[in-house]
Amino acid sequence: EEQRKIQSNILTTHGMKANKLINAWVAFVVACVQMLSDNGKIAFVLPAEILQVAYAEDLRLYLSNHLQKITLITFEELVFPNIEQEVVVFIGEKGGEEKGIRIFEMNNLDDFDTLDLSQNGFKKLQHVKEKWTKYFVSAKEMELINTIKTDKRFTRFSDYGLINVGITTGNNNYFSVTDEVCEMYDLEDVTLPLIGRSSHLHGVYFTSQDWDENRKGGKRARLIYFPDTPLEQYSEKHKEYIKLGEDSGEDKGYKCSIRDRWYIVPSVWVPDAFFLRRNNLYPKFVLNRCNAVSTDTTHRIKFYEGVDPELVLISYYNSISFAFTEICGRSYGGGVLEILPGEVGNIMLPKIQDLPPEKKNDIINRIDNIVRNNLDIELALDIGDQTIIDLLGIDSSWCKQCRKIWRKLQHRRLKRS
């Protein structure tokens, strides 16, 4: 506890937020940089989290403000396989004119034999809290990304609706059930259609047919949502299921134990759409067509009044927006792309504001067919790219460059799988 106080003091003294989520290495780096001489250099082996996690955003800003040169050396292979954590070599320099940041990507430690630090130029470092993963793209590509951010033909995903985490049940195994369990305890009238895993989503619509397929396949496709009424009013079968949970200790988990009534799941509402939190090739964005809900494996989206969900859907499946999913998200481990609600909100979408119904349906049906049948997603991106080129006059070279950015960042991430 004393050590935590010292760490907090180091962070707050330098204008940074302190909380229990911040690892000790963050404060250690700040303290060391603060002690550097005017022309000093410093080097660390750090968790690769420094590049992207939210709790290190204050650190990224601090380092960009206090160092003239930052060099990062990353590795495609795990350097310390026993700890299964990605690391980077961080080199910071004070003094002289500001040069910015540069990144060297290496396969493994053997590449140090041929490393030439003079062969990689610095990029201008933006003094913001944004992720440093964006510096894996070239200066020309970064210029395009920044241009898109200020182009009036684009807007942030968050401008279309509220993006929230899925339902935290506290115990998915207990609260998400199969048809068999539902029938056994007569739970039909206290369950909602559920998306419990990424594999439950098939196309860009989640329909009653999709839900039926999941149920008949024996998946936990129902969420138990007991009403906030006195327990005495519950049926005997429902009381029996609650007693079953208590006998097996399901009520003792932290999330359940802090509720007034452990078996009533909070914050249950039906969203307009879903966005996958953790993804392999790309994040699926799916419209809700059967009043389903989701666990926290999937984010929930409630569109603002007047927003056409289908136009937002079309505006997502293109090379530019896909490039932003990789820029805004983070590599979670094993090559998985994790993207949190605030990061989804920062994805740039082209403003498709008007489209004849038959044209809109044709585009969505073609994209849905590609996604639903696990065809190459680039076929869907081709459709989306041509749509925004035709409707908004987007330069085709922008789509080509962003497709290249998406492939590059996706490939880098997947090489860790």
Description of each model-found segment:
Residues 1-170:
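Signature of N6-adenine DNA methyltransferases within the class I
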Residues 24, 186, 190-191, 379-383:
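Residue-level detector of well-ordered alpha-helical segments, enriched
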Residues 59, 238, 312, 383-384, ...:
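Generic structural signal for hydrophobic residues
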Residues 73-77, 329-335, 378-382:
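A generic structural motif
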Residues 88-93, 107-108, 271, 320-325, ...:
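A general structural signal for short secondary-structure boundary/capping elements
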Residues 141-357, 361-365, 369:
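Polybasic, glycine- and aromatic-enriched phosphate-binding surface used to engage nucleic acids
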Residues 353-394, 398, 402-406:
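Extended amphipathic alpha-helical segments enriched in small hydrophobics
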Residues 411-417:
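Non-globular, low-complexity intrinsically disordered regions
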